[in-house]
Amino acid sequence: MQGHAMAVDAKTGNSLSERPTVAFAHLGCEKNRVDTEHMLGLLAEAGYGVSSDENDANLVVVNTCSFIQDAREESVRTLVGLAEQGKELIIAGCLAQHFQDELLESIPEAKAIVGTGDYQHIVEVLQQVEAGERVNRVSQTPTFVADENLPRYRTTGEAVAYLKVAEGCDYRCAFCIIPHLRGNQRSRTIESIVAEAHQLAEQGVQELILISQITTNYGLDLYGKPRLADLLKALGDVEIPWIRVHYAYPTGLTPAVLAAYRDVPNVLPYLDLPLQHSHPEVLRAMNRPWQADVNERLLDQIREQLPNAILRTTLIVGFPGETEDQFEHLAGFLERQRFDHVGIFTFSPEDGTAAATLPDSVPDEIAIARKDKLMTLQQPISAARNASWIGKTVDVLVEQHNPSTGEMIGRCSRFAPEVDGEVLVQPGDNGLQVNPGTMVPVQITGADIYDLSGHVVSAAHMVAAARAAT
C-alpha cells in the first residue's frame, strides 16, 4: 500500500496526472477500519498513491477514535506526533466528529476535519486542501452508510474481511457516546450486503465478520423489524466458509436468529454478547433495564440450541454507584456462566453521556482492583475451555508462516481476530506447510489461557482416524 499511482478518469477516459501519495493512520475499532478502507479505495480510484507508512507522504489522513478517554488520548498523541514531524493532517473519524472546532484551533497542521458521516467526500476534501483551503466537512447528524458500490481497499489481508451491515445506533446506554458520534441506526438492504459478500468471496475471503453497533438490531429501521435471521440465511449461499457475527445485543437473539446460527452451515456458532453487567440495579443505571431478566435465560437458550456455542462477552466494572455486593453479583455471574472469552473494562466517564453526571463515582483504585479480580477469576475458566479442545481436529485459517521453522500461526473458529487467541501450528510428520490465507486441518495438542497449539493433519491420518472410529 505505497508509492505513486497513475489512473484514468472513469468518466472521461483521459489519463490523470500523477498525484501525490497520501499516508493513512488508522485508530479504533473494526467499524472505523471499514471507513478507512473506503477512503483508501476512493483515493486510489482517483489516482492518488496510498500508504500505511507516514514517511511516504507529507499529508496523512488519521482516522481517529473517541470511544473512551484512553482512545482519545491515543488519537491525540498520534496527531501531535505527526504534526511535530511536519506532516499536514486530515483528521477523520470519531474524534473529528466530537471535537471538530477544538482540533482545528489547537492543531494548525490540521488542514481538514472529516466527520463520521462524510468520509465518502475524502477526494473532494483532499482536492480542496491541495487548492490551499482549510476544510471542515462534518455533518451535525451523520446519515451516510456505505454500500457495495463505494470503492474499498482492504487492509486486513486476503483471507479476512469485515462487512458493515448498518451504521449508527438507536439505543442510549448511559455510558456510551457512539450515538452522538455516529447517528441513529441506518441499515443496508439484504441485497446490498449479500452483493458485497459475493464480491469479497471472489477476492478470496475465507472469513467474513458482520459488524454494526448492534448487529441483532439489523434491519429494524429499514424493514420495521429486525431481520438478522433473514440476512444470515441469505449469506448461506455465499462461498465463504466462515461467517462470524459481532455485537449481538442479548435481547435481539430471538429463536429465529438462534435457528439461523444453527441451520446455516457457514455461520459460526460464535456469539459476541456485550452484556456489560449482571446486577439489575446497575443495568438500570446503565439504561439497559430490560436486560437483567434476559441474561441467564438467554444463555441457557443459547446452550440448548447451540451446544457447541463459543461465548464472548464484555463487562464494565466501577460504574457509578456500583456497590461491593453488586460487584460480587457480577463475579458470581461470571463464574457461573463460564464464558470462553471475556473483555473487562473499568468505567470511563464520557462528556455528553448520562453516566458522566451520575453521583457516587467509584474510586479508580477500587475499579482497577475489581477488574483484576474478574480477570483472575476468568483465567482458569478460559484455560479449561481451551483445554476442552485438546484432541480435536479443527480447521485453522493460517495467517502467518515462518519459512525457516515451518511453524504457522492461525485461528480456529473459536477465535475472532485481534480480540481472542491464536493457534500455533507445527507442520506435521510429513512436513506439510501452507501459505497464509489457507485453511488446514489441525489436531489440537496443547492449550493455555489464551491460545491453542497443534499440528497439521495429513489426509492419510484423517482416513485412518475415520476407520478407527467405525
From Swiss-Prot:
Per the UniProt entry, what is one GO biological process?
tRNA modification
The protein's UniProt keywords, in alphabetical order, are:
4Fe-4S, Cytoplasm, Iron, Iron-sulfur, Metal-binding, S-adenosyl-L-methionine, Transferase
Which reaction is the catalytic activity of this chain? L-aspartate(89)-[ribosomal protein uS12]-hydrogen + (sulfur carrier)-SH + AH2 + 2 S-adenosyl-L-methionine = 3-methylsulfanyl-L-aspartate(89)-[ribosomal protein uS12]-hydrogen + (sulfur carrier)-H + 5'-deoxyadenosine + L-methionine + A + S-adenosyl-L-homocysteine + 2 H(+)
Q: Which residues form the TRAM domain?
A: 387-458
Cellular component terms (Gene Ontology): cytosol
Kindly give the Pfam families that the UniProt entry links to this protein.
Radical_SAM (PF04055), TRAM_2 (PF18693), UPF0004 (PF00919)
Give compartment(s).
Cytoplasm
| MTTase N-terminal domain sequence ranges | 20-131
- Protein residues bound to [4Fe-4S] cluster 1: 29, 65, 94
Enzyme nomenclature, EC number: 2.8.4.4
Chain sites annotated for binding [4Fe-4S] cluster 2: 169, 173, 176
Q: What is its main location?
A: cytoplasm
Q: Radical SAM core domain spans which residues?
A: 155-384
The Gene Ontology terms for molecular function here are: 4 iron, 4 sulfur cluster binding; aspartic acid methylthiotransferase activity; metal ion binding; protein methylthiotransferase activity
Cofactor detail note: Binds 2 [4Fe-4S] clusters. One cluster is coordinated with 3 cysteines and an exchangeable S-adenosyl-L-methionine.
Per its UniProt record, what InterPro entries does this chain match?
Elp3/MiaA/NifB-like_rSAM, Methylthiotransferase, Methylthiotransferase_CS, Methylthiotransferase_N, Methylthiotransferase_N_sf, NA-bd_OB-fold, Ribosomal_uS12_MeSTrfase_RimO, rSAM
- Record carries keyword Hydrolase: no
Q: Which cofactor does it need?
A: [4Fe-4S] cluster
Which SUPFAM superfamilies does the entry link to?
A: Radical SAM enzymes
In the record, the note on similarity to other proteins reads: Belongs to the methylthiotransferase family. RimO subfamily.
Instruction: State the protein's purpose.
Output: Catalyzes the methylthiolation of an aspartic acid residue of ribosomal protein uS12.
What protein name does the entry list?
Ribosomal protein uS12 methylthiotransferase RimO
Q: Which organism is it from?
A: Synechococcus sp. (strain CC9311)
